Amino acid sequence: MIIKLIKAEFEDINTILQMQKVAFAELYEKYQDTETSPATEKYEDILFRFNQPETTYYFITADNEKVGVIRVVDFKDGVTRKRISPISIMPEYRNKGYAQHAIIEAEHIHGKHNWKLDTILQEAGNCYLCEKLGYHQTSKTEIINDKLTIVFYEKD
């Protein structure tokens, strides 16, 4: 199976939004995070980020099938950490290694060093993936509600 990142275009914003809503719906139901969940974002939120010069959205494809979306924030200044936020895999494509391959490909495109990302502390599989890819937890966490804590990772 060939995994690729395909740069999204302006006309893809609705597709990005719909894929993100579907991909994060289960986590939204589980944690009821109305403030920061990608499942609750609107078109204008994606449009705002899409227009940021440091942001690139990519479709994650497996044999030319769209299986998810990843957003990379890269100021390309050699100082500011690059950021993945968010990465989403459609439910029917999970647990097949697509997120891992997408992160590796993003690092290949944007450079392997000086990254950060965050994930849900309570989602052990997400934390395992970050650590498997060489990211280490920082001391920073953010409690969103009584069910959900965000943990932050970096990779040098």
Model-derived features with residue positions:
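Conserved acetyl-CoA-binding loop of GNAT-fold acetyltransferases
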Residues: 131-141
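A short beta-loop-alpha structural element at the N-terminal edge
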Residues: 3-18
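Conserved acetyl-CoA-binding loop-helix of GNAT-fold acetyltransferases
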Residues: 86-89, 95-108, 128, 132
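A conserved beta-turn-beta hairpin within the catalytic core of GNAT-like acetyltransferases
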Residues: 74-85, 94, 113, 144-149
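A short helix-loop-beta-strand connector motif used in the catalytic cores of GNAT acetyltransferases and
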Residues: 47-58, 68
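Conserved GNAT acetyl-CoA-binding A-motif
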Residues: 108-121
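Conserved beta-strand in the GNAT
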Residues: 59, 65-74, 81-83, 88
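Conserved GNAT-fold acetyl-CoA-binding loop/helix
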Residues: 21-47
